């Protein structure tokens, strides 16, 4: 399939058929689940850009951000990259009217960096060889989505950070 051709460089051991077995049951149940999600009240819709940026910095610091090894910047589209075993960089963005966008993008991109920092870079000859490289793009993305969706969107996390989003 066209999907498999495009996915092979990133996920060589996965097939469209294998993914359909995994996702078809979810596809059937997802509409009912989404219908149960309450609408937001927009309480934080006008959070100033400077506060959004500060909250993202506070988040990084609470998760062990080290400005000697890490760099955070602002860009049009969030991304992360590792330039060496002690050089992790992420960018985030601020979107007017979407106060959680910067915070969640920061959580996601920092998740990529945390995964990279957990690779065995301290082993001889690990970087930039396969031993010191991510298993796959899917595993890499799963780790960043874990921090964004399972941690930063959790009820306990919301309780901890709620006051920062209220003016």
Where are these regions (language model features)?
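Glycine/charged-rich beta-loop-alpha catalytic/anionic-binding loops adjacent to active sites
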Residues: 88-92, 123-128
């Amino acid at each position: 399939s066209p999907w498999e051709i495009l996915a092979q460089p990133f996920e060589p051991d996965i097939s469209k058929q294998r993914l359909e077995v995994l996702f078809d049951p979810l596809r059937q149940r997802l509409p009912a689940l989404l219908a149960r999600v309450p609408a937001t009240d927009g309480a934080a819709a006008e959070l100033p850009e400077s506060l959004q940026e500060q909250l993202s910095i506070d988040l990084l610091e609470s998760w062990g951000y080290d400005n000697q090894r890490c760099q955070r910047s602002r860009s049009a589209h969030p991304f992360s990259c590792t330039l060496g075993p002690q050089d992790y960089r992420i960018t985030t963005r601020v979107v007017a009217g979407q106060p959680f966008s910067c915070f969640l993008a920061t959580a996601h991109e920092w998740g990529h960096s945390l995964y990279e920092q957990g690779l065995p870079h301290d082993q001889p000859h690990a970087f930039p060889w396969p031993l010191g490289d991510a298993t796959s793009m899917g595993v890499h993305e799963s780790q960043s989505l874990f921090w964004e969706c399972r941690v930063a969107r959790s009820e306990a996390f919301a309780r901890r950070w709620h006051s920062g989003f209220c003016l």
